[in-house]
Amino acid sequence: MGDLPLNINIQEPRWDQSTFLGRARHFFTVTDPRNLLLSGKQLEASRNIVQNYRAGVVTPGLTEDQLWRAKYVYDSAFHPDTGEKVVLIGRMSAQVPMNMTITGCMLTFYRKTPTMVFWQWVNQSFNAIVNYSNRSGDAPITVQQLGTAYVSATTGAVATALGLKSLTKHLPPLVGRFVPFAAVAAANCINIPLMRQRELQVGIPVTDEAGQRLGHSVTAAKQGIFQVVVSRIGMAIPAMAIPPVIMNTLEKKDFLKRRPWLGAPLQVGLVGFCLVFATPLCCALFPQRSSIHVTRLEPELRAQIQAQKPSIDVVYYNKGL
């Protein structure tokens, strides 16, 4: 037995999730791209530390910081419900490098229709992999649901991009640079509700403050999905709004006119810089364990809760990612 006590709750994040700062610190750790560089041996070592600690066995000499580091490495690579290792590009730590590359290319190759359609398709394919890799173990995504969401989101993104591209032909060049963002925003509004359509049909679990399940609510599901859509669009705003303005200015300068090949890597770099901060900060906009007032729930569920526990005014639910 080591010196580390067994009362550290590694089932929950390390930092206070009721504050924005605590949530931001949590997601900066979860989305850390450096976790992608860890070897299979290092991942297995972290898994052993976490599983042993949960079983009451402490690795000799283990410190609290090392335990939390192992917990976040474990969470970054293994599915929380199934325990399976998540495919590399489906991990949360892959969000920044993958989105940096895809978004940078969407913003660089937006002028020609074939390349614009190609990169919108690549983006939605990546989103499908992420959504499937991080699917809920309690409410798994079926292949049919995944396929419907994938086709619908890709169609919506491409249709939005093509429609706006034709509308912006006679507008200033800067306006045309924002077409990819509009397409991504439209796709998120289609993709996320479709991926979580089962929740919109049967609801998501709502609990009291102690975590005791009180029932299922479609209203809570709608609120959670709305929060996720806002967060996803918010993540895209800095990366898809700031670089176009900067690049529109730089491309008029002699430096880039003489070196046009620098445009793509420069754009990807700018997008990456924005995403390093935007991804964790927008994930932290809303608490993972969100709340909703009992009076806003469906009449049947509201009556059930008020009959069983009349003192409860607020219930809680997991909003998802």
Curated annotation (Swiss-Prot):
Keywords: Acetylation, Amino-acid transport, Membrane, Mitochondrion, One-carbon metabolism, Transmembrane, Transmembrane helix, Transport. It is found in: Mitochondrion membrane. It comes from the Eukaryota. One of its GO terms (cellular component) is mitochondrial inner membrane. The keyword Acetylation applies. The chain crosses the membrane at residues 146-164, 174-194, 225-245, 266-286. It catalyses: L-serine(in) = L-serine(out). GO terms for biological process: mitochondrial transmembrane transport; one-carbon metabolic process; serine import into mitochondrion. The keyword Transmembrane helix applies. GO terms for molecular function: L-serine transmembrane transporter activity; monoatomic ion transmembrane transporter activity; transmembrane transporter activity; tricarboxylate secondary active transmembrane transporter activity. It is a multi-pass membrane protein. Pfam families: SFXNs. InterPro entries: Mtc. The modification N-acetylmethionine is found at residue 1. Belongs to the sideroflexin family. Mitochondrial serine transporter that mediates transport of serine into mitochondria, an important step of the one-carbon metabolism pathway. Mitochondrial serine is converted to glycine and formate, which then exits to the cytosol where it is used to generate the charged folates that serve as one-carbon donors. NCBIfam families: mtc (TIGR00798). This is Sideroflexin-3. It comes from Rattus norvegicus. The lineage of its organism: Eukaryota, Metazoa, Chordata, Craniata, Vertebrata.
